[in-house]
């Protein structure tokens, strides 16, 4: 259900175990900063909800959507963290088959139009990705690729960042780094929505 005045989105379903996403405070005076979890079992409709919000579509049967007052919502699904636009085929091929003599694009060559952005610099520091610009794309770890996906989305200055299954494939150390980065995103004024399966994954 949408309260278009207060920008409160509620997703109530027999399939979705939990879920109320608040993208603004009740006064409607702004979007609260922090991490909002939406939790449900596999197949409960979390990703569908995220896609509806990110694309600005209303599903009148379930009364889902988002307020016109929220102009920029970005969603990242981590089921395939190598899905950078335009380089996914290259990455998958070169990750498995590239030789030392093959030419492979660097991070700087792929994102050259964004490297001078204050947003890029800010979040590169938050995610500890300094000097990653010279690294070849096929040598990036899954964690580095995940962080680049987020920075790439943040360069578009979203009001809300929706992260679907953000902990897939992360070991304990990487997960700790990721949680710390999320805290810093909150401190820097970014609203984050996590789509999760396990209540224990809700960040503290």
PLM regions with names:
Residues 50-114:
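ABC ATPase nucleotide-binding domain signature region
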Residues 116-132, 154:
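Conserved ABC ATPase "signature" region
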Residues 136-140:
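Conserved ABC ATPase signature
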Residues 150:
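Hydrophobic anchor residue at the start of the ABC signature
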Residues 155-159:
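A short, proline-enriched helix->beta-strand linker immediately N-terminal to the Walker B motif
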Residues 161-165:
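Catalytic Walker B motif of ABC-type/P-loop ATPase nucleotide-binding domains
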Residues 172-173:
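Helix N-cap at the start of a conserved alpha-helix in ABC-type nucleotide-binding domains
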Residues 195-197:
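H-loop/switch region of ABC-family ATPase nucleotide-binding domains
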